[in-house]
């Protein structure tokens, strides 16, 4: 092989699969650090402005309902906002190793990525507490720990009782609750209902009290309210 061609191939294969951190502009929104991809500030400015406006509104809402000490911990969680075809809407990234192995910037570890801003905007009406949901994942991971025994015990009870196997869904009818996927989703879904509104029953706090009173006690304990 031509040495120059070989060198070019090496350079190409050495390129990372992800956008470098230098491709983002750092902003402060409601006390949170937000990395905004520069394309959403230039080429797709309208999409970027609408996404950041909604994110700001959701973060403001969180500061109004979540107890202050918990908010201060949540504010340590960074956001990354961009168009990333690997992310349908928004997700929390707990693992640096997973990020590196799947073509994501490892610096997104312990951060929330809004990689599908179009869906983030489009799904806002039916999932108004999406940002809180992802922050609850971060809180579970970074503050409480995934081995938090009370959450695990309540999740185990929920699975064994089958009380979430067929619950009301916001569009009508009944479905298997998303909370049953694992104890992490259980905590995030119930946190949505605790502080606001979820798209699966229990939708709001009084319904948690009726449907899952032991988990209500846990939510009060871990969130400090």
PLM feature spans:
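Acidic/His-rich structured neighborhood in mature extracellular/periplasmic domains
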Residues: 37, 49-160, 203, 216
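Short acidic, Pro/Gly- and aromatic-enriched capping/linker segments at domain boundaries
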Residues: 14-26
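Acidic/histidine-rich, surface-exposed loop or edge segments in extracytoplasmic proteins
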Residues: 26-49, 116
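Sec-dependent N-terminal signal peptides
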Residues: 2-12
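A generic hydrophobic-helix recognition signal that picks specific residues
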Residues: 24, 126-130, 178
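Metalloprotease/metallohydrolase-associated module, dominated by Zn2+-dependent proteases
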Residues: 100-119, 125, 155-225
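Short, solvent-exposed loop/turn segments at secondary-structure junctions
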Residues: 41-42, 84-87, 193-195
């Amino acid at each position: 092989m031509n040495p120059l061609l070989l060198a070019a191939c090496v350079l190409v294969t050495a390129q990372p699969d992800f956008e470098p951190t230098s491709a983002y502009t750092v902003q402060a929104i409601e006390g949170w650090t937000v990395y905004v991809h520069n394309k959403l500030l230039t080429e797709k400015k309208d999409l970027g402005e609408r996404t950041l406006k909604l994110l700001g509104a959701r973060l403001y809402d969180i500061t109004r309902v979540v107890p202050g000490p918990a908010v201060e911990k949540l504010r340590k969680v960074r956001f990354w906002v961009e168009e990333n075809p690997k992310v349908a809407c928004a997700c929390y990234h707990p693992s640096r190793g997973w990020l590196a192995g799947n073509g994501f910037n490892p610096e997104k570890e312990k951060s929330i990525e809004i990689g599908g801003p179009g869906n983030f905007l489009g799904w806002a009406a039916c999932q108004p507490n999406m940002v809180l949901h992802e922050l609850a994942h971060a809180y579970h991971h970074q503050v409480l720990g995934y081995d938090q025994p009370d959450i695990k015990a309540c999740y185990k009870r929920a699975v064994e009782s089958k009380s979430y196997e067929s619950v009301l869904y916001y569009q009508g009818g009944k479905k298997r609750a998303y909370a049953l996927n694992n104890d992490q989703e259980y905590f995030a879904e119930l946190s949505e209902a605790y502080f606001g509104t979820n798209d699966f029953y229990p939708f709001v706090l009084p319904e948690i009290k009726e449907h899952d009173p032991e988990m209500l006690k846990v939510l009060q304990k871990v969130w400090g309210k």
